[in-house]
Amino acid sequence: AMLIASFALAFTACKKEEAVAPVDEAQQALVAPAKDDDAAWRKYLQAVAVQNMGNTSNSPFLYYLAPESDPEFQGKYERQVESATNAMARGVQPGNMLVFGSSASAKMADLIDAAFKGIQPDSMKGVRVLFIGEAGDNARVQSIVQPTGAEYIFVEAK
């Protein structure tokens, strides 16, 4: 919950900056940080999310996994699976954006697979799902998300 709150603050700050200095249509490509740099990855995911907001007006829901080198990785992974699964089960309203990203791209794809199980076809129309990961995981995640009717966006972390 803290992460979402801090993201909302970061997003609000970015919105204020945009009013002062409009961003070019051709936004600069963001470069993914080193695989094990947890703090830099959090900032990177927030920046990519802001660039991909589109018409989404609500603060996005960010699901992030720490690097696999984190000694508590498995526990953090299990908690995020539970959190994302519960959120999907409650339903996601149109106009919202879900952001999934991690240097542990394959594990994030596993998390998305678990969270989206049981989601009714076309029940997420008007929802934007952003996956930030490795190109090798894109097709798998897209095949999981597409039946829900959500708008799927992939950004390669490179």
Model regions: which residues?
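Bacterial N-terminal signal peptides that target proteins for export
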Residues: 1-2
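Bacterial signal peptide processing site
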Residues: 14-17
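Post-signal peptide N-terminal segment of mature Sec-exported envelope proteins
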Residues: 22-44
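General marker for long, soluble alpha-helical cores
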Residues: 47, 51-56, 64
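Mature extracytoplasmic domains of secretory-pathway proteins
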Residues: 63-124
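Extracytosolic low-complexity repeat regions of secreted or lipid-anchored proteins
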Residues: 114-141
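C-terminal partner/receptor-binding element of secreted or periplasmic proteins
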Residues: 132-158
